[in-house]
């Protein structure tokens, strides 16, 4: 009865569309009862749907505010980025048929409890320096592919061949040694140790590389971390500060830097721009582009259509664990990806 102001911070980040509708209905009931709501979100379409008034912050500072009825999404984007570029479509003049494979996945299957497959006889390859996108709806099996590649599911079947040699995967540490690095979907739970500072988080996966006999070479560790902070432009006042002192975008850069410091041949990125603002997304895309140009092979999972269209050289689409489409270059269009993402559902419906 005493509630006057309700603050909601990214309340829809893990909700389905139907659940979002329920939340918005409750919010409208609360505002009708006289309760004020501060709604923090990077999902601009939600701001336009549920908001009455919007305030834009950039780098912790006030930029602008307006009534929602007087503005549109491009106005918000302009205020958030300060007129910075929207990320252009990736367009490289590369004859991929002449580029060697770094990774080949053949007939990959991951059994599902109760029968069927989470990943169903999947085949794909990855070229040196290529950005391969994996698109699909929730439950498509995308993250499970990464989990198989990183050794989390030793029960998987099929062949995983890296630079011509078949891998017999047993553990995550083995896969890191083999040249894989994973940027997980949930950076807070899986990508960061919240009790450690920025430097220790950045160095964590590459500690083997800083061994000096039975000890760690702290000087070498610090030099490598400093260089990575500079290379991917992590905005940090002091690397000894707690990791949670950073913005979401800079925390994500630390997770990416941690992976890069293991000197991988293949970088797996699961929803790398989730929960960060538009400006930080552009910076993450720049990082992807930079390392791909240097020859790093990258696989990106994304639920954001515009994002995957922009950054990928090639996209495979999964639905219910089945590969339902593969698109190259200018074939990568939002409508074709969406259509392919529904094919597996239709297959399952016909079989059941």
Where are these regions (language model features)?
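Glycine-rich phosphate-binding loops of nucleotide-dependent enzymes
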Residues: 1-352
């Amino acid at each position: 009865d005493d509630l006057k102001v309700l603050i909601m911070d990214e309340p829809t980040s893990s909700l389905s569309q139907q659940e979002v509708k329920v939340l918005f209905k409750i919010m409208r009931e609360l505002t009708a009862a006289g309760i004020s709501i501060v709604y923090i979100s990077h999902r601009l379409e939600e701001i336009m749907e549920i908001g009455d008034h919007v305030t834009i912050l950039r780098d912790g500072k006030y930029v602008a505010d307006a009534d929602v009825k007087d503005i549109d999404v491009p106005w918000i984007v302009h205020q958030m980025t300060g007129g910075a570029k929207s990320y252009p479509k990736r367009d490289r003049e590369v004859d991929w048929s002449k580029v060697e494979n770094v990774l080949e996945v053949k007939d990959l299957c991951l059994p599902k409890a109760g029968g069927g497959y989470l990943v169903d006889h999947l085949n794909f390859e990855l070229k040196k320096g290529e950005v391969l996108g994996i698109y699909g709806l929730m439950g498509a099996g995308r993250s499970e592919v990464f989990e198989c590649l990183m050794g989390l599911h030793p029960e998987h079947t099929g062949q995983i061949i890296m630079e011509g040699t078949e891998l017999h995967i047993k553990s995550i540490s083995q896969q890191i040694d083999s040249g894989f690095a994973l940027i997980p979907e949930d950076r807070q739970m899986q990508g960061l140790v919240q009790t450690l500072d920025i430097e220790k988080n950045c160095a964590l996966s590459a500690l083997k590389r800083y061994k000096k006999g039975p000890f760690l070479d702290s000087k070498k560790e610090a030099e490598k971390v400093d260089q990575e902070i500079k290379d991917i432009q992590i905005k940090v006042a002091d690397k000894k500060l707690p990791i949670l002192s950073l913005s979401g975008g800079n925390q994500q850069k630390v997770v990416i830097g941690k992976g890069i410091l293991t000197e991988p041949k293949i970088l797996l990125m699961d929803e790398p721009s989730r929960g960060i603002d538009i400006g930080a997304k552009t910076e993450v895309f720049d990082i992807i582009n930079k390392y791909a140009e240097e020859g790093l092979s990258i696989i990106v999972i994304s639920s954001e259509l515009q994002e995957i269209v922009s950054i990928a050289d090639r996209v495979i689409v999964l639905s219910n664990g089945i590969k339902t489409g593969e698109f190259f270059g200018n074939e990568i269009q939002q409508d074709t990806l969406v259509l392919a993402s529904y094919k597996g559902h239709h297959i399952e419906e016909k079989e059941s």
